[in-house]
Structures are given as structure tokens and as C-alpha cells.
Amino acid sequence: MSDQDHSMDEMTAVVKIEKGVGGNNGGNGNGGGAFSQARSSSTGSSSSTGGGGQESQPSPLALLAATCSRIESPNENSNNSQGPSQSGGTGELDLTATQLSQGANGWQIISSSSGATPTSKEQSGSSTNGSNGSESSKNRTVSGGQYVVAAAPNLQNQQVLTGLPGVMPNIQYQVIPQFQTVDGQQLQFAATGAQVQQDGSGQIQIIPGANQQIITNRGSGGNIIAAMPNLLQQAVPLQGLANNVLSGQTQYVTNVPVALNGNITLLPVNSVSAATLTPSSQAVTISSSGSQESGSQPVTSGTTISSASLVSSQASSSSFFTNANSYSTTTTTSNMGIMNFTTSGSSGTNSQGQTPQRVSGLQGSDALNIQQNQTSGGSLQAGQQKEGEQNQQTQQQQILIQPQLVQGGQALQALQAAPLSGQTFTTQAISQETLQNLQLQAVPNSGPIIIRTPTVGPNGQVSWQTLQLQNLQVQNPQAQTITLAPMQGVSLGQTSSSNTTLTPIASAASIPAGTVTVNAAQLSSMPGLQTINLSALGTSGIQVHPIQGLPLAIANAPGDHGAQLGLHGAGGDGIHDDTAGGEEGENSPDAQPQAGRRTRREACTCPYCKDSEGRGSGDPGKKKQHICHIQGCGKVYGKTSHLRAHLRWHTGERPFMCTWSYCGKRFTRSDELQRHKRTHTGEKKFACPECPKRFMRSDHLSKHIKTHQNKKGGPGVALSVGTLPLDSGAGSEGSGTATPSALITTNMVAMEAICPEGIARLANSGINVMQVADLQSINISGNGF
């Protein structure tokens, strides 16, 4: 070795890469590629020829390089067939000036300079061939490229630690995948101490030093809504209405008197103070305040005050006492009932009522409150209260009536003001009753008026209550049906065992329009007659037909086993309900038009009628018959319309078409069409009066009625109209309240408590069913009147 080679770094780690040449390498003991660390000395040639060589202990860096380079390079191949001249040279790589960097596939060795670098020493000469043993050493240079050190297969899953200076001191990076947080952010390390601040929203911000990134929290923090102190400054403060103090959160409603047209004033209910009027006592106490204060204490009369005592009002006191007997006079009979506005299923009351004629001691602009309680005592509450400044200028007397259900049977005394011109009575009903805003206006020099209101029970029974008012005219702005019938002096005629002789009430001309008269039956009654029009049940879905005093006819068709009930309405046109003749097929077809449909009567055009062969020449009074002239038929009909319908059946003409959706069937007769429509709707309009059964066809009903007739007796015609009398007092006690019910017998078949559906069917047919109370049962024979 020369001195120049010896002056190089002695501790340089070299990697000796020997190409395996087998046993041909006489000087080397290792046949394969081996790694050794050679230290340069002056006797370098002798150390390489000495059989095994002298090797010192390798350094750790050399072992690392040797371990990483066990995989042979692709350009390194062992060729045993070459001659001794082609000896495998050994390359030495100097790792002093190299740097290691991590790549995608492993570690890369980066050269320090781009030029030629003396990286290895190779021994060459005749010692390789074993001929001369001379040693010659020369420096070999490698190009400054990147060397890739691949990982060995036996070093899998091992962590290789290395220190990267200049990035972060005292921190070792592991060759593993990078850390990731929950939300996908990479974990970052700050080199310098960061200042941590926390704001009001719950987010943590790290303010770094120079050249550092900011770590923010992507998670939604708690949103804090800043309180706006100026939000509620625009709210309107609550103020008391009519000098009333509002407390709590209760809704307050102020009733203000409203003036309407016609000198009608509506007063709030709470502006009138009530004083109790005990019905058991004979003295009535009415308290009045002489001062301007709105509230006055009511004075209640006790039972110890006798009926004959009369206490006069003092000058210094504002309260005064009046006796009820001094102004209450009975002008009607004792079987009048208190007015009942209830239309629910409960029965009305039957207690006695006395109608007064005048009331004394009432001052101007005073309000009288008459209220019927729901208690069993049935007391009337009356009171007077001085109105405020709003009503001081009003000089009209107003009475506020609040009718409620009275369940007791005690006698009640009604209060009524003296009849004055322009006097207004305002009536208010409770919320569960149907008559609302009923106004009663006083009319001088007028006859007595009777007000009746119906109550329909669940079984169809109708209960009527009556109240007679003096010098009052009923005005109902909401078109509630109230029947008004002036009472006139009538007498009960003489009765016999066979029939009843009835005297007429009055002529139709003497009674004003709208009243109910029964002239054909010639019905009269006792002085307590109650005439009730069931058409007032308009709220139950029953069609209302006005009655104009035309007679009610009850006729019997000759030769027919059934009864025909007909009503001759306005104009004299007959609308009747034929219960015997029905839809019985082709033998007796019914070609009557629909209700309300008017057709012109036409002469029969059949050949028999034209030739005058339809009527028998021997009997001129015999009913004309219409015979079908089609050969082979010969059917006989009593009506022209029936014959026409039969002829349409022969010709195939079907003018009546069903208008139901997706049907379009056509029929010869109109009754067939009506019967077909009931199959769509499921309507059974024909109800049996004896049992709850209903039928779609009238002939089916007729056959069903005959079954009842066969059980009770033979055919006959009898009509019995009667009701239970209206009891006073005793009838209202207990659960069994006596209520008037319609009782009609046809062919000796009793129809008690007609159901609302039956009444509706009669009303739709144009028949007005009337109910007369306080009458004895009247039996009329078939050939009567």
C-alpha cells in the first residue's frame, strides 16, 4: 500500500462486496459474497493472500449496511464458467458522506456529491489468479446517484428508528402509518409551546408561534344565544278594561251594552244583580239602591212574612217590599206549563204558572232579572240594580229572562212589567238550548199569546210546553219555528156512543193566516186546548210545510181493504199516500211520477177507448177499464198511465235511465227506476208502523201489514187521534213524566210514539201531522163525517 492510501480515514467502514467465484479464488476462504471490514495498512497485499484474512470486529453501521445489502443486485451475477482473468471484483461503498432517506419502498442512500467519490478499495492483481501473488490497490469511483436499500424478508414487522435532525429534537418518528383523529384530521405536533385559549362557544383554539399551523375543532360547539335586553321593550303593557284589575292569566271578556235598530238594547248579563225570590213565601222582596253605586246587596224575603202584610217603603231607606199577591192575578187556566226551551231528550216540566197583568214599583232604567234555576226548588231570582252612567239616560224598561230547566213541581210566579209603549223585553237562553235571542215586544190592546216549544225524546215522543203572555208579540229573528194559536172561546159538543159530534172552532176567514185549523174533522176542545204543529221539528231534518187552514181529509176507497189518508193542501191539489196500492209488478203497475212532478192528464189512445168499448154499456156508473189491445195479452188496467207503461213494455221503450255512476240502466216505468235507485242507496223508505221493520218496496210493506191485520182482526177503517192530557204538578214528579204522544190507529192498528223517520216520510210526502193535546179519544167510523 502506498502512503497516500494509508493517509485516508482509518476507521472508514467499507462494505466489501465480493462476487462469488467458488473455489477458484485461491486466496480467499469464503466462497460466496461476504461482508468484511478491512483496515488499510502497509501490508495490505499480504493480508489478502493469507488464507482467511485478518479481520477486525465490524462496526454497527457496517453490520446495518451489510444486512440491508444481502439481496443481490441485478447486475451482480456469478459466472463460474469464466476464466481466471475474469475474477469477481469486490466493491466497497463508503457510507461516511451518504445520507439515508425514507421512500415509498424502502430506504434510499443519497450521495453527498454529484461527482466521482472514492467509495471503495479493491484489491486486484495476480493474487486473484494465484499466479504471482502481487497486490495492487487502486481507487474505484462510483457515480453520485441514489442507492435504494431494500428491506430484508426476515425483517418484516420490525420498527426501524432513526433520528432526523432539524425537525424536532428528542422525538423519534416510527415508520408506521400516520396517526389520525376521529374526524379524519392528522395529528400535528407543535415545536414550541402553544398558548391555549377558550372562548365562550366552548371551542379550544391553540395560538401557535411562528410558522405553525392552527389546530381547530371541527365539532360543533354549544351555541350560546346572547340575551337581547331590548326585545321586550316593544311589548304593549296590559291595561285593565272598564276599571277592572287584571290578575293571573285568565281571559277577560267585557260585555258592553249594544244598541240596535228598533229601540232594542242588548245588556250584558253580569251588569244585573240578582235577588232571590223564594217561591214558598208569599212576599217578594226587591232591593234597589238610591245611590250611584253599581252594586247593591239583595234582600231576601223569608217564609215568615204573611201574604196579607204589606210593608211600605220609607223615605230614608232605598229598599222597598211589595207583595206578590198584590200584582199577580190569574187570568188563564191552571194547566198551563212553564215555557221550556229545552230540545234535548229530557222531558219538559208541567208545573203551574200564573200570568200577571201588571207589576208596580219598578223605576225607570231599572233591569229586572228573572232566572229559573235547575234546582228542585225551582225558585225565581229577581233583582234590581241601578245602572251606571251609560244607562242613566235610557228611560226604557228592560227585562232580562234566562229560562233554565225546572225539575221541581212547585208553583212558580212570573213577574211582568206594566204594558208600556216602546217597552222591550230581551230573552236569552242558556247555551244548551236551541232558542236564541228570542225578543218579546210589548204591544198594547192585543189578545193573549201562547208560546209552545217542542222537545223530542229518544223514542220519538214529542213534549210541548206552553206559556201564555199578556200583551206580548213574539218575534224570532233566527227563524225558529214557534206556533202561535190565539185562544178563543169554544165549547165541547155532545158525544154519543157511536160517533162524536164536533162543533167547528171558527171559520177560516176569521182566523189569521198561519194558524192551525182542523175543519174537516170538526174538532173542538175544552178551554185548555193546545194546538201543536209537528212541522216545528225542522231542526230534526223534517221538512216544514205551511198550513193555511185547509181541511184534512180522511177517506176510504170503496172496495179497498186499506185506508187512504190524504191531505188537501194549498190550491186544492190532492197529495195522498196510497198505502194499499203499491208496486206489485206488471199486474198493477204504478206509473205515478215523482213527488213534486206534475203531468197533464191525457186521454187514453188505445183502440178500446177510442171505440168506446172500455166502459160497459149496461152500467154507466161502472169504472172505466183500459184493456191492452196487443194480441194475446188482454191485461186490464184502471189507469191510463198504467196502460201506457204496459204498452212501453211491449214496444221495448225504456225512457227512464238510471243516473247513478257507471250504471246507466233503463226502465219502462218510473217506479221501477225509483226502486232501482234504492238498491244503490240502500234506502228503505217504507217503515212498518207496528214493528221496526223497513222495506224498499211499498207492496212488501202492504203484505207485511196484512200479517199484523190477520193477527188482530178483520179489515176495517178507524182513525183514533188522542193524546195524554198535560198534567200539572204531579206529572213532573218522579221519573215517569207524562208527555203528550201521538196515537193513531189505522185498521185497528195502534201507532204509538211515531218515530222521527216516519214523521219525516210523511212530511216529505206533503202531509202535515198535527198533534192535539187535552182531548178525549175520538173514534170515527169508516162512513163517518
UniProtKB/Swiss-Prot annotation:
Q: Where in the cell is it found?
A: Nucleus; Cytoplasm
Q: Where is this cross-link: Glycyl lysine isopeptide (Lys-Gly) (interchain with G-Cter in SUMO)?
A: 16
Where N-acetylserine occurs, the residues are 2
Impact of mutating residue 703 to A?
Abolishes acetylation. Increases recruitment of p300 to the promoter and enhances gene transcription
On tissue specificity, the annotation reads:
Up-regulated in adenocarcinomas of the stomach (at protein level). Isoform 3 is ubiquitously expressed at low levels.
The listed outcome for residue 394 to A is: No effect on phosphorylation on DNA damage
Identify the stretch(es) annotated as VZV IE62-binding. 619-785
Supply the name of the protein: Transcription factor Sp1
Species name: Homo sapiens
Organism ancestry: Eukaryota, Metazoa, Chordata, Craniata, Vertebrata
Q: Which gene encodes it?
A: SP1
